[in-house]
Design a protein with these regions (language model features):
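A short helix->loop->beta-strand "cap" motif at the edges of active sites that frequently abuts
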Residues: 144-147, 154-159
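Accessory regions outside conserved functional cores
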Residues: 137-140, 160
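Positively charged, amphipathic N-terminal segments that serve as targeting/anchoring signals
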Residues: 2-134, 141-146
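A general structural signal for short secondary-structure junctions and capping/turn motifs
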Residues: 26-27, 150-154
């Protein structure tokens, strides 16, 4: 008997983020170098009207989702996670609000958005269209550094 669609869907947003982190960790453990994780929340995006995070507080809801995902991913991989946000203002605000945790913060417009010596995994959170070139550059740089890492070096986790 095949499961119904409702049987395989997550029961909650928290369950969805946990499943996404587990799937990401599984892909990383199998040697995948690039992963894309998309979580669509109808309250934050209306594909019919095109309105994206139109209500007050919507962006903070999204940032909190990225925090939950990254915390779960870090606990599953036990690596150092760098979360790269679209701009330095967001990265600074979240770093201040959340304090020191299991991951560090960066922004797409940083001179050095990640440090291959210190960061095991790079998560680029909600890049905007203006940041596409930076996302491509970060992805390529991280992949090159992972590919040139010495065998047995734990610093081989790429951007998610």
């Amino acid at each position: 008997m095949e499961p119904n669609d409702d049987d395989v869907l997550p029961d909650s947003l928290d369950d969805c983020l946990a499943r996404a982190a587990l799937a990401s960790a599984s892909g990383l453990s199998r040697g995948m170098l690039r992963l894309i994780v998309e979580v669509f929340v109808p309250e934050l995006f209306d594909p019919l009207s095109g309105a994206m995070m139109a209500n007050e507080g919507d962006q903070m809801k999204y940032w909190n989702m990225t925090r939950a995902y990254c915390q779960r991913l870090q606990s599953l991989t036990e690596g150092t996670v760098r979360v790269v946000y679209p701009d330095a203002g967001v990265a600074a605000m979240l770093s201040s609000q959340w304090g020191e945790g299991n991951f560090t913060f960066g922004s797409l417009n940083d001179r050095k958005p990640f440090d291959a010596e210190e960061d095991d995994l790079v998560v680029i959170a909600c890049p905007d269209p203006q940041g596409v070139d930076e996302v491509i550059k970060i992805s390529r740089d991280a992949e090159e550094q992972a590919a040139t890492a010495a065998p047995g070096d734990d610093k081989t986790m790429p951007p998610v």
